[in-house]
Regions:
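Phosphate/NTP-binding elements of NTP-utilizing enzymes
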Residues: 1-186
Length: 186
């Protein structure tokens, strides 16, 4: 709950945690909440992880589960969420993309260009493995005050951008999740 409240209340949230606590599940829950609480067409979710396999087989698998359990709009595929907006006159519009998962090339600064919506949520799963260039590309999506960023992972690499944003004064609201907070730890 603290993580969702942080995303609600802060533009940027960093969650540092141990292994095996369900980080991808937490990210998927936040994504489901974000899409469900905004008008289709006004919100867009961009997700990434260090590998394409992590994007599809881990994060988007969890997003699909969240979507399937809830009364959430649209449909979820292996790496996309599509939904039908309601037009001002009450008729359904044309189905549109409201979120996707991608693993761009590590040095592709244009990876997330062309994404425009009044509210954008950027999610990095396993953020410790994301290269600096993709952090810069994602930051370019934070152009308006209603955009949000959630980065979640294990800050194991002392040279990573994720380790830096977990430090005080980084501009991120940082939440630590201990192994002792997880039911997976016995």
């Amino acid at each position: 709950m603290r993580i969702m409240e942080s995303v609600r209340d802060h533009r940027k949230t960093a969650v540092r945690s141990c292994h095996e606590i369900g980080k991808s599940f937490i990210a998927a829950e936040v994504i489901g909440w974000f899409i469900a609480t905004r008008r289709i067409g006004d919100a867009f979710v961009v997700t990434s992880a260090p590998t394409a396999k992590q994007v599809a087989a881990i994060l988007w698998r969890e997003i699909g589960r969240v979507h399937g359990r809830g009364d959430l709009p649209g449909r979820v595929t292996a790496t996309e969420w599509k939904a039908v907006p309601v037009l001002p006159d009450g008729r359904p519009g044309k189905e549109e993309l409201v979120g996707f998962g991608r693993k761009p090339d590590d040095y592709d600064m244009t990876a997330f260009q062309g994404i425009h919506a009044p509210e954008v949520l950027v999610v990095f799963d396993e953020a410790d493995g994301m290269p600096p260039e993709l952090w810069e590309a994602a930051d370019s999506l934070m152009a308006n005050d209603d955009s949000k960023m959630l980065v979640i992972g294990n800050p194991d690499n002392p040279q990573s951008q994720f380790r830096e944003v977990c430090k005080p004064g980084s501009g991120f609201n940082t939440i630590g999740v201990s192994a002792f907070d997880s039911p997976n730890f016995t």
